[in-house]
Amino acid sequence: MSSEKIFLEGESCQSSWHNATAGYDETDTHLEILGKPVMERWETPYMHSLATVAASKGGRVLEIGFGMAIAATKLEQCNIEEHWIIECNDGVFKRLQEWATKQPHKIVPLKGLWEDVVPTLPNGHFDGILYDTYPLSEETWHTHQFNFIKGHAYRLLKPGGVLTYCNLTSWGELLKTKYNDIEKMFQETQTPQLVDAGFKCENISTTVMNLVPPEDCRYYSFKKMITPTIIKV
């Protein structure tokens, strides 16, 4: 993993992200936007783990961030009814629209930043949520998921619904600079924020998988990954 930081101090990509080129490489194993490493194919087992949790209650699932369709494709293999997907980048959204025509379940593609789209969605509408967007500024690098979770995740879920999420760009940095125990990292940096959002500690659980990133991965080098399961009761 490169020692170069993903974001420079004060850097923000938010205003230019939507129409920046979606750089899928020739082998479709990497996605870069504005030079940022958004997603890589080696994440597949982990993305499938997140998708399995998000689909575990069936029904209507909200996915925030489409990327390379790794989690989305897994969700479509699960026993769900509807699949709502928010994506703000033009090129990625075009790929989402093409992908949607080939899927077995009802797909509802929603174009825009989640900050603009999510407030329009009704309360108690989803059985599952998978949040995996890319941070768009240095200021929100480690915290953007909490803006969604505290502002919207709890209200969007039906009672008994499930939330899962990740912020690999943040967690990769934390596991490189501050933590060598991934469960401790989650308990100290994530769980208190989830409780603040209305979820109860006893309804927050995690599973850990072994997964070795390639040496040239710029955002994650830790050899374990963590999948949260957060239930609204």
Swiss-Prot record:
InterPro entries: GuanidinoAc_N-MeTrfase, RMT2/GAMT_Mtase, RMT2_dom, SAM-dependent_MTases_sf
Pathway stated in the Swiss-Prot or TrEMBL entry: Amine and polyamine biosynthesis; creatine biosynthesis; creatine from L-arginine and glycine: step 2/2
Sequence positions that bind guanidinoacetate: M39, E43, D132, L168, T169
Any one Gene Ontology molecular-function term assigned to this protein's record: guanidinoacetate N-methyltransferase activity
Gene Ontology BP annotations: creatine biosynthetic process; methylation
Boundaries of every RMT2 domain copy: 1-233
EC number: 2.1.1.2
Residues making up the signal peptide according to the UniProt record: none
Catalytic activity entry: guanidinoacetate + S-adenosyl-L-methionine = creatine + S-adenosyl-L-homocysteine + H(+)
Gene3D superfamilies from the UniProt entry: Vaccinia Virus protein VP39
Oxidoreductase in keyword set: no
List of residues binding S-adenosyl-L-methionine: W17, M47, F66, G67, M68, A69, I70, A71, E87, C88, N89, W114, E115, D132
Quaternary structure annotation from Swiss-Prot or TrEMBL: Monomer.
Stated family: Belongs to the class I-like SAM-binding methyltransferase superfamily. RMT2 methyltransferase family.
Protein name, entry field: Guanidinoacetate N-methyltransferase B
Species name: Xenopus laevis (African clawed frog)
